[in-house]
């Protein structure tokens, strides 16, 4: 009988294995790791009838027990799509899919909103799901954050509930690359700046992956304020273009924009005031327009959209307020895992700001981030594996504020609190500009630790 092997015991791998097993597909899982936590995950799947092999690297030898029956291999987002072993399997006639493709097969009867982009996609995903749900639609979110798409499919099957009206799915370049048959009803492209180049090689390759999702969408929505997307506009026919800056971005008419009086407008009339969304920053005005365009495409009235915007609580780890320490408002922006996202967060702050930055550095242009540091920051506290590299970048940009180095976030928070008080900062911001994997499982774990440390400081002051 045709066999499927799932590579990786992470969240997406577990979800894919459980979904395949529940839908009658013989499935096994391999993972190169070992240890107590991984063994617990493996045992949980074994109890559900899924064979799991640990300490099994991504090599042909790991697949030999099933090679005669092997029909498909399902990879987690962290596995390179062009890995030599996967190419070997393809040459043997084995199909290679990502977890998102498995989920699509089970969920394609429900209309999807597929949201991608270098930055902004998490906020747009949360906000759109919230607006739709507030309007009475069942529109759960998942994908690259929260519940994996495979877990969502499995939960819907097991609960035997009425199918949702919409699925609001955040899709990373890794997921899109490994699931080219996904065809969303609505596709949203938030931004495009260089990221994940260590995986994709070039900006052109990275762009092409994201573009593919929008080309396969029935209706596409674009952020005309993003320089890269704006340069591509001539190559697109149709779609909805939004701008928080102008009714005529780069000489082309926008379909939805914010006018000089602060109102969201379409080509026929003003719709509602943009202040309906109380989140700071120009980037969130762009996010507001992308969500509004999608909600109107789905059929919501301006009044319903406004009600959802006004009740939106915000996104964890994205400029998330964490109270005050002295005169400084504290923000958790752990989701800022690259220079561009960190610069966007800094732009939304009122200075002077004490910034905590660090982690695993990524390839990318740091120019905009360094400019914002010079403009807004009175002090920068560095921590983690990228400390020396970031220190060199910041000193090379002639930063005139305090610049200190610490080994970890705990000691960095202590230093940042001291600096904020001594320098009279109005904001204290965790804005790593780096991935979290040097010291944390993911950016959520890093942000949660930051909030815990801040709450400890606040408790000591009370």
UniProtKB/Swiss-Prot annotation:
Annotated positions binding ATP: 117-123
GO BP terms: cell division; cell wall organization; peptidoglycan biosynthetic process; regulation of cell shape
SUPFAM superfamilies reported in the protein's UniProt record: MurCD N-terminal domain, MurD-like peptide ligases, catalytic domain, MurD-like peptide ligases, peptide-binding domain
InterPro entries hit by this protein: Mur-like_cat_sf (IPR036565), Mur_ligase_C_dom_sf (IPR036615), Mur_ligase_cen (IPR013221), MurD (IPR005762)
Keyword Iron-sulfur applies: no
Pathway it works in: Cell wall biogenesis; peptidoglycan biosynthesis
Molecular function, one GO term: UDP-N-acetylmuramoylalanine-D-glutamate ligase activity
Catalytic activity: UDP-N-acetyl-alpha-D-muramoyl-L-alanine + D-glutamate + ATP = UDP-N-acetyl-alpha-D-muramoyl-L-alanyl-D-glutamate + ADP + phosphate + H(+)
Chief place where the protein resides: cytoplasm
Sorted UniProt keywords: ATP-binding, Cell cycle, Cell division, Cell shape, Cell wall biogenesis/degradation, Cytoplasm, Ligase, Nucleotide-binding, Peptidoglycan synthesis
Enzyme Commission identifier(s): 6.3.2.9
Family statement drawn from the similarity comment of this UniProt entry: Belongs to the MurCDEF family.
PANTHER family in UniProt: UDP-N-ACETYLMURAMOYLALANINE--D-GLUTAMATE LIGASE
UniProt-listed NCBIfam families: murD
Name of the molecule in the record: UDP-N-acetylmuramoylalanine--D-glutamate ligase
Organism: Parasynechococcus marenigrum (strain WH8102)
Gene name, Swiss-Prot/TrEMBL: murD
């Amino acid at each position: 009988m045709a066999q499927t092997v799932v590579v990786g015991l992470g969240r997406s791998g577990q979800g894919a294995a459980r979904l395949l097993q529940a839908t009658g597909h013989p499935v096994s899982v391999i993972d190169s790791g070992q240890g107590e936590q991984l063994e617990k995950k493996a045992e949980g799947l074994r109890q559900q009838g899924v064979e799991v092999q640990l300490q099994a690297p991504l090599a042909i030898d790991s697949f030999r027990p099933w090679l005669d029956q092997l029909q498909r291999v399902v990879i987690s987002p962290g596995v390179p799509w062009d890995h030599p072993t996967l190419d070997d399997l393809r040459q043997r006639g084995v199909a290679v899919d990502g977890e998102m493709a498995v989920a699509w097969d089970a969920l394609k009867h429900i209309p999807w909103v597929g949201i991608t982009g270098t930055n902004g996609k998490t906020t747009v995903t949360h906000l759109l799901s919230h607006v739709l749900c507030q309007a009475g639609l069942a529109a759960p979110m998942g994908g690259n954050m929260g519940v994996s798409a495979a877990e969502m499919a499995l939960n819907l099957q097991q609960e035997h509930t009425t199918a949702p009206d919409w699925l609001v799915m955040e899709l990373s370049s890794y997921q899109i690359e490994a699931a080219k048959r996904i065809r969303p009803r609505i596709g949203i492209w938030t931004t495009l700046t260089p990221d994940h180049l260590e995986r994709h090689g070039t900006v052109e390759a990275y762009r092409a992956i994201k573009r593919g999702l929008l080309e396969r969408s029935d209706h596409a929505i674009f952020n005309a304020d993003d320089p890269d997307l704006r340069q591509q506009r001539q190559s697109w026919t149709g779609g909805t273009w939004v701008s928080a800056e102008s009714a005529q971005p780069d000489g082309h008419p926008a379909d939805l924009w914010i006018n000089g009086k602060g109102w969201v407008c379409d080509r026929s009339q003003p719709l509602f005031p943009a202040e309906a969304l109380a989140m700071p920053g120009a980037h969130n005005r762009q996010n507001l327009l992308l969500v509004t365009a999608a909600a109107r495409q789905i059929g919501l009235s301006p009044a319903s959209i406004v009600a959802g915007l006004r009740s939106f609580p915000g996104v964890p780890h994205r400029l998330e307020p964490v109270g005050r320490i002295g005169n400084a408002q504290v923000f958790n922006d752990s989701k800022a895992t690259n220079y561009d996202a960190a610069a966007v967060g800094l732009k939304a702050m009122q200075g002077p700001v004490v910034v905590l930055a660090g982690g695993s550095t990524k390839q990318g242009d740091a120019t905009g981030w360094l400019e914002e540091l010079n403009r807004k920051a009175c002090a920068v506290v560095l921590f983690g594996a990228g400390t020396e590299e970031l220190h060199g970048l910041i000193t090379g940009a002639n930063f005139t504020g305090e610049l200190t180095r610490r080994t970890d976030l705990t000691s960095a928070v202590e230093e940042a609190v001291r600096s904020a008080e001594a320098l009279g900062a109005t904001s204290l911001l965790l804005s790593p500009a780096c991935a979290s994997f040097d010291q944390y499982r993911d950016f959520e774990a890093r942000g949660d630790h930051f909030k815990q440390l801040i709450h400890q400081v606040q408790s000591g002051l009370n």
